């Protein structure tokens, strides 16, 4: 509920049942990222739906969910419960605190893992927006302290080129205006809202330059919100220190060498090298933790090469451009793999295998 930018989720205060208003859903799919139980599902019509426990029957005491009524073994129950359980084959319950009780089998143990692997769909616009916004922000920040030209125009172009195509990521584009409705709790609303204001203020600052620092502030808010959008506990491969380090590092490692070349400030080059070293450390630390699930390549070695080139640029400044381009290549590959190899919490099943083999066992679930 808190993640939905369009306020399409509603919770019944009496029964606790949560459902999605199909007339409000914009189809961005962010709730499918945030849920660790595979409950929200994308529909062919562009919206997202979820089980709502047949709320038309539950409301007013007209009946119980059809699945509970139809289950021939009585394995399902619906009603008020006290306490809960956290079996190791489900996601940690403190992520969403679900009203779910799972009774494990009396004998044996369920051999399954809730961690699964997949590739995110339609992620090119997300790659473009995150990379371009980070580069635009850092160039604009640097321009406040160094003699860098065309900063308002670059900020406008990078955010517009990144944000506008990302509109299509919300499949119900005719309702995209709803993405701004949940600024109170949705990082996605904050990301898009502040990004939109950045574009507007950058455009105005072409005529009124004094507004440019305000545009930079909103750009910083947008990038910070972008980081938080992906810091989801339901997705362990994203919920990692490498995410903020790489998102911030993208701008630093690609922009500072260029800024050093344009301004003649060689002191920026060691700073870029330090950030590259931090990116290398965070990447290989993340890679080590994900080895069980996915095999990430050694493309981040490009960052090591960029670090060497940046340091050599202190002696021969034109090399800084090469260092920036090498860093950009490393960042693009890293961001592509960020979306291509995703580990997430879900329900172990046969259609999307979990990372550990499962054993056929019986369990009883009470909802």
Positions of PLM-derived features:
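Ferredoxin-type iron-sulfur electron-transfer modules and their immediate structural context
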Residues: 1-18, 22-34
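Membrane-interfacial helix termini and the short, flexible loops that connect transmembrane helices
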Residues: 15, 114-120, 141, 177, ...
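Flanking helices and flexible, charged tails adjoining ferredoxin-like Fe-S electron-transfer domains
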Residues: 24, 32-126
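N-terminal signal-anchor module of multipass membrane proteins
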Residues: 94-99, 103-149, 153-156, 340-344, ...
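Long, contiguous internal "core" modules enriched in hydrophobic/ aromatic residues
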Residues: 120, 130-135, 145-150, 185-186, ...
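Membrane helical hairpin/interfacial module
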Residues: 150-201
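Juxtamembrane/interface segments at transmembrane-helix termini
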Residues: 170-173, 333-348
